[in-house]
């Protein structure tokens, strides 16, 4: 009788294992992070295969099908997200706009991180007057009204794509310089850097093979957190007509273009606006999650 009772009590125990594993999984990977990763992967897939996924060329016009509403608003599957006043397919333009905006944001963020990290490491290595100059440049950059300067530069020199990417790359480099300088100074005071230096290793090897790999996780987290800001900056400048110029297209370009048809054809700017919001939100969620897991200063 005792064995029967013991067996009855012990029967539910196997169910606790899978439930606890699921709880641990969602604790390590929250649903919001999984959704953010899924959206980012979808955007990267679209950017890589926009030529294959787009049913039309983003410059193809059809004046007989101008301002066609999307499927949910009385349109047909010929234009899933509708068309603009020149008959261009909004869905096709959206796919190529995602590619363009992500490329600009990626190279702009990478350029800013490269400039800032290089200056930060130089300040940490040479110290003294070099550090003073770098800190002065950091304060100067942080105090500049970047948007006004960007408007002036693009209006004066024209809106070439290369100049636009370089200009975005010079935005926000000071945050990487501060991080790289502080972490490099801390790393130089630790035993492994001093030991390599005493063995006669050159400075480029010390920083390239020992210091930089140890501070890379924090820099990557900072890049992830800055990426949404770069997307919004590109979208804002393109919205004002100073970013990506026709016939090229970007998310901000589409929003600025659809502004003129907000009353008659709101779908022109609705789709790129939703993509901008969801993309920046997803990358921000992923960046916060990476910061909690990778940033050693939070442990």
Give, region by region, the residue ranges found by the protein language model.
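A general boundary/transition motif marking the beginning of the first structured unit of a protein
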Residues: 1, 10-14, 33, 55, ...
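Transmembrane alpha-helical segments of polytopic membrane transport and secretion proteins
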Residues: 1-38, 285-299
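Generic N-terminal simple sequence motifs
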Residues: 8-10, 14, 51, 65-66, ...
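Intrinsically disordered, low-complexity segments enriched in proline/serine/threonine
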Residues: 14-16, 20, 57, 71-72, ...
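Alpha-helical transmembrane segments of integral membrane proteins
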Residues: 31, 86-299
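Hydrophobic alpha-helical transmembrane segments of polytopic
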Residues: 35-43, 164
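Hydrophobic alpha-helical transmembrane segments of membrane transport/permease proteins
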Residues: 38, 46-83, 242-248
